[in-house]
Amino acid sequence: MEGWQRAFVLHSRPWSETSLMLDVFTEESGRVRLVAKGARSKRSNLKGALQPFTPLLLRYSGRGEVKTLRSAEAVSLALPLSGITLYSGLYINELLSRVLEYETRFSELFFDYLNCIQALAGTTGSPEPALRRFELALLGHLGYGVNFTHCAGSGERVDDTMTYRYREEKGFFASVVIDNNTFTGRHLKALEEREFPDVDTLRAAKRFTRMALKPYLGGKPLKSRELFRQFMPKRTVKMKKD
C-alpha cells in the first residue's frame, strides 16, 4: 500500500534494538502489522508519533504478512485520555486486535473507532455509553446481526414490560424465567437505539455485548479488563479521601 492513509496504532512492542513492531488499524486496509525501522533510535522523529490514540497518516510497503513502514505523520496531538478513559481506550484497542483479521477493510468501523475515542476524550462522566455503542457497532461490522425490535418466536414487536431470552444466532424469545440471559423489552429498545438513559439499561447492554463478543474472544481473558479492575479500587479509595 504505497499511498497515504489514515491510521491509529493499536499496540507496539520493541523489535530489535532500534525498531518497533506495530499493530495498526487503517482506514483502507483494516488491521496491518508493520515494522517501523529505526523508530526506537534517539534520532528518530517517529517515536513520539507512533503512540496509541494519535491520528496518523502513514505509508507502508511489502508483500508478506509483516509490512515495512515507509513514513508516518501525526495529524494532530494524541487524543487526551487518562485514568478511566485511558483504560477504556486500551480496551477497545485490544478488542480490535483480538477480533479483526489482518488486511480486511473496515472503513466504516474505522470511523466508529475514531468517534469512540473522541467521545472518550470529551466525556466528563462515565465512558460506558461510548464503549457499548462501539461494541455494538463492531458486532454489526463482524456480521453479527441481531433483531432487537421483534420477538423471534412470534414476530411481534417487543413489549417494554415483557421479558425476552436471547438465543445465539436465533434472536430474542419471550420468557417467563428471569436470569442473566434475559432482557426486558425496554432493554432491547435501548440496544436498538444505542441510547442508555440509566444504569439499568447500561448494565443490560454490557451483559449483551459480553455475551455476543465471547465467541470471538474465546477463553483468553482481555489484559485491559484486568488492568481496569486493578485501577478501579485505587480510584474508589481516592474518591473516598476527596
From Swiss-Prot:
Gene3D superfamilies of this UniProt entry? Nucleic acid-binding proteins (2.40.50.140), Recombination protein O, C-terminal domain (1.20.1440.120)
The terms describing its cellular component in GO are: bacterial nucleoid
Q: Where are the transmembrane segments?
A: none
Q: Which UniProt keywords apply?
A: DNA damage, DNA recombination, DNA repair
Q: Which Pfam families match?
A: RecO_C (PF02565), RecO_N (PF11967)
The record, for InterPro entries, names: ARFGAP/RecO, DNA_rep/recomb_RecO_N, NA-bd_OB-fold, RecO, RecO_C
Q: Which GO BP terms sit in this record? A: DNA recombination; double-strand break repair
Q: Does the keyword DNA repair apply?
A: yes
Family stated for the protein in its record: Belongs to the RecO family.
* Function of the molecule: Involved in DNA repair and RecF pathway recombination.
Quaternary state and partners of this protein?
A: Monomer.
- Its recorded name reads DNA repair protein RecO
